[in-house]
Structures are given as structure tokens and as C-alpha cells.
Amino acid sequence: MADLQTQMKHAVADAAVEQIKDGMVLGLGSGSTAALMIRALGAKLASGELKNIVGVTTSFQGEVLAAELNIPLLSLNAVDRIDLAIDGADEVDPSFQLIKGGGACHVQEKLVAAMADRFVVVVDSTKLVDRLNLDFLLPVEVLPGAWRQIQKTLAAMGGSAELRMAQRKAGPVVTDQGNLVLDVKLEGGITDPASLEKAINNVPGVLENGLFVNLTDEVLVGEISDGVAGVRSLERRLS
């Protein structure tokens, strides 16, 4: 499955780069699929197929990779708008609502997505779900001095929250903003993403949570058919 999943990720990354035009200001996402997209973008810039592109990254991971590939970058504060943002997701529901933040970058990712004229999400088919949070925990970035109190508040809201621990350092994960992450599980999953996003963000000490509500314009889904990787486009229909 790992090889097939990698094929799907490459397929959607390449499809996303096809939407990039000369002169664009691009939001460059984080995570494994977004990294493949950034590499594909770097190759097109190096070959001259794309020109005058400027990127705005959503994480230190993306900043390092873009610099390695000689992709020109600007900070979020240096741009007034973003033409196109491309990013991955941890879960996508049928209404195009997302959970992001598996890489603890969801604060910057949401800022960039909100600024973009168009936000395209790139995922493999395993990320499509009927309901958010049944499998993937909801990340919530919190101030270090308040995490335990916020954990109690989230419990009162029906969520079981655990402090995310680092894998290759002693202690918790620390975000690019210097904060901590609580991973939250709601009994029965998330039935009303819009209301929950606001409710969690209203808790004192919470910086941002990983629910992305009504931000996505298109989802590019990598799929395997007859052993071959392909891409299906899902576009949000505005009512």
C-alpha cells in the first residue's frame, strides 16, 4: 500500500502544479504531498517552464525545501494577496471541510488558505472520510502555560485531549510559533465543523485549531485504477 500511496501523492502533486501560471504568488503547503508539489514546482522553475513565481510557505519545513530548490519566497506580511494556495489535508469530508495539523503547521496553513484567491487541496484517496475525527485527531495549538486548563475545558465540551509528544526529542511537540499541540477526539466524530471551530477558538489560550471550514475550492484526489495512479478533481459547488 505504501508504494501505491506514494504513486497517488506524486500524481496529485503533479496535477496541482499544472494549475500554476507565470507571475503567481503561491501559498506552499506542508506535509509529504505538499513537499512533492514544491519539488515539482522547483523543477519547472529550473527548466524555465514557469517564471516569476513567488512562494509564501506555511512552515519551516517548506521554507527549507523551497530554499533548497531556489524558489523565491516572501513572508506572509510582505504580500497583500495570494493567487493560489496548494496544501495537503489529514481528512476531507463530503462537504469539503478539512482536518489539518498532523505536522503541527495548521496556524500558518490556515492563514495562507484564508488569504488565497483559490485554495486547492491535494490528497490521496485514503484521506476522504464520511465524517471528520472518527479516525484522525483534531489538533489544537495552545499556549504552553495553559495547556492543562485548556485540556479540562475541552473535556467539558465533550473532547478527550492529549498533549502531543515529540518522536525524536524528550518532551512535547513545539510548533513553529513556540506553542504546544493538544490532539482532540470527539465521541462520534465531528458533526458540525463550523460551530466546533468557533467554539474551540473561543477558549482562552487557544491560538487555532485544525478545522478548515469553507476554505477549500477544489480537492485533487489521487486514486489507483487498474494499477495505475490517476487524479480525480472535486470542486465545491457554491449554493
Curated annotation (Swiss-Prot):
The keyword Transmembrane helix does not apply. Pathway: Carbohydrate degradation; pentose phosphate pathway; D-ribose 5-phosphate from D-ribulose 5-phosphate (non-oxidative stage): step 1/1. The gene is rpiA. NCBIfam families: PRK00702.1 (NF001924), rpiA (TIGR00021). Homodimer. HAMAP family: Rib_5P_isom_A. Belongs to the ribose 5-phosphate isomerase family. Substrate binds at S30, G31, S32, T33, D87, G88, A89, D90, K100, G101, G102, G103, K127. It comes from Synechococcus sp. (strain CC9902). Catalyzes the reversible conversion of ribose-5-phosphate to ribulose 5-phosphate. One of its GO terms (molecular function) is ribose-5-phosphate isomerase activity. It comes from the Bacteria. Keywords: Isomerase. InterPro entries: NagB/RpiA_transferase-like (IPR037171), Ribose5P_isomerase_typA_subgr (IPR020672), Ribose5P_isomerase_type_A (IPR004788). This is Ribose-5-phosphate isomerase A. It catalyses: aldehydo-D-ribose 5-phosphate = D-ribulose 5-phosphate. CDD domains: RPI_A (cd01398). GO terms for cellular component: cytosol. Its EC number is 5.3.1.6. GO terms for biological process: D-ribose metabolic process; pentose-phosphate shunt, non-oxidative branch. The active site is at E109.
